[in-house]
């Protein structure tokens, strides 16, 4: 099971209803943060997410609404006597900005902070990978892909029966080693399992104009969290952001399962934005959501379920 928790769903500045961008991805007990806008630690407290479970932070770019919560988050970790290292990833200048935080005031963390400046790369971890790709925002900026590793196919009862295998330690050994000797023959894992199952894929663009790289990296994503700051091109002006229509078109072309319209400009109320976005997305046939603060998208058995932590009283 994987969960995407929207700690801050607004853009540019906080409002009474929405905080600035911060997204937590919860997977197998780990919390991965994508952007840490001002007040992220408070949002985590409200969502009952422990900062001590955060091992990796991925920052898309260094406009204040996407990273100013980093200092408070690190200091809170220190107050809680954190010992394990923290890894911070981001575009060019990440090292400089993080060092500025660490050198400000009378504060030194009691744990290691490792900074990684990225271009376009693929980071491999135990059960998943993180891919970074360049987006168009007028400054060094990255989008990110979380890609769970593909899983083995399910054991096929008829194949197990064919080889005289039953559930138990022997199947555990087969899964671990990839093959076993049984009744005088070698049985491989693929002999008794179905097709490999594709791991879940989540893409976050950060702030960006429409660009072909997003479509390429979002191909067949289960969830695309796309900058959709404005309802219309006329509202955009000279900013390096996307409209709802542009986000929908990217999702349609990339054959995305679910589109999350993110970074809504503070000029729009939720109802106003929902009304306008619904018309646009329905015309393109895109399945979409407009996240609010503390919305949770849970991916299980190939489907997304949406709930809100505060409304559910969790």
Swiss-Prot record:
Keywords: Endonuclease, Hydrolase, Metal-binding, Nuclease, tRNA processing, Zinc
Residues where Zn(2+) 1 binds: 61, 63, 137, 207
Catalytic activity as recorded in UniProt: Endonucleolytic cleavage of RNA, removing extra 3' nucleotides from tRNA precursor, generating 3' termini of tRNAs. A 3'-hydroxy group is left at the tRNA terminus and a 5'-phosphoryl group is left at the trailer molecule
GO molecular function term, any single one: zinc ion binding
CC cofactor note: Binds 2 Zn(2+) ions.
Top-level taxon: Archaea
Active site, renumbered: 65 (proton acceptor)
Pfam families: Lactamase_B, Lactamase_B_2
Cofactor(s) essential for the protein: Zn(2+)
Keyword RNA-binding belongs to the record: no
Binding, Zn(2+) 2: 65-66, 207, 263
InterPro entries xrefs: Metallo-B-lactamas, RibonucZ/Hydroxyglut_hydro, RNase_Z/BN
Cystines in this chain: none
EC number from the UniProt entry: 3.1.26.11
Amino-acid biosynthesis recorded as keyword: no
Enzyme class name: hydrolase
The family this protein is said to belong to: Belongs to the RNase Z family.
Subunit and partners: Homodimer.
Stated role: Zinc phosphodiesterase, which displays some tRNA 3'-processing endonuclease activity. Probably involved in tRNA maturation, by removing a 3'-trailer from precursor tRNA.
PANTHER family associated with the record: ZINC PHOSPHODIESTERASE ELAC PROTEIN 1 (PTHR46018:SF2)
HAMAP family from the UniProt entry: RNase_Z_BN
Name of protein: Ribonuclease Z
Gene (UniProt): rnz
């Amino acid at each position: 099971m994987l969960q995407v928790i929207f700690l801050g769903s607004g853009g540019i500045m906080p409002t009474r209803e929405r905080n600035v961008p911060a997204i937590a991805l919860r997977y197998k007990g780990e919390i991965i943060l994508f952007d840490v806008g001002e007040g992220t630690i408070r949002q985590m407290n409200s969502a009952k997410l422990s900062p001590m479970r955060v091992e990796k932070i991925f920052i898309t770019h260094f406009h204040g609404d996407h990273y100013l919560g980093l200092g408070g988050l690190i200091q809170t970790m220190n107050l809680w006597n954190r010992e394990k290292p923290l890894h911070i990833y981001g575009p060019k200048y990440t090292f400089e900005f993080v060092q500025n935080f660490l050198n400000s005031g009378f504060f030194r963390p009691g744990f290691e902070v490792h900074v990684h400046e990225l271009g376009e790369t693929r980071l491999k971890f135990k059960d998943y990978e993180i891919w970074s790709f360049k987006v168009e925002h007028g400054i060094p900026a990255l989008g990110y892909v979380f890609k769970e590793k593909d899983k083995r196919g399910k054991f096929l009862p008829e194949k197990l029966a064919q080889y005289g295998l039953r559930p138990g330690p022997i199947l555990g050994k087969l899964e671990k080693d990839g093959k076993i000797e049984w009744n005088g023959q070698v049985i491989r894992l693929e002999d008794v399992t179905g097709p490999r199952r594709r791991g879940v894929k989540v893409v976050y663009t950060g702030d960006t104009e429409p660009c072909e790289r997003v479509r390429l990296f979002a191909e067949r994503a289960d969830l695309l969290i796309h900058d959709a700051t404005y309802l219309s091109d006329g509202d955009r002006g000279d900013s390096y952001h996307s409209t709802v229509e542009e986000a929908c078109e990217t999702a349609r072309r990339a054959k995305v399962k679910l589109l999350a319209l993110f970074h809504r400009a503070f000029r729009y109320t939720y109802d106003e934005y929902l009304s306008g976005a619904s018309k646009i997305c329905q015309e393109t046939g895109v399945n979409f959501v407009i996240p609010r603060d503390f919305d949770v998208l849970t991916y299980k058995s190939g489907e997304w379920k949406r709930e809100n932590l505060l409304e559910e009283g969790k």
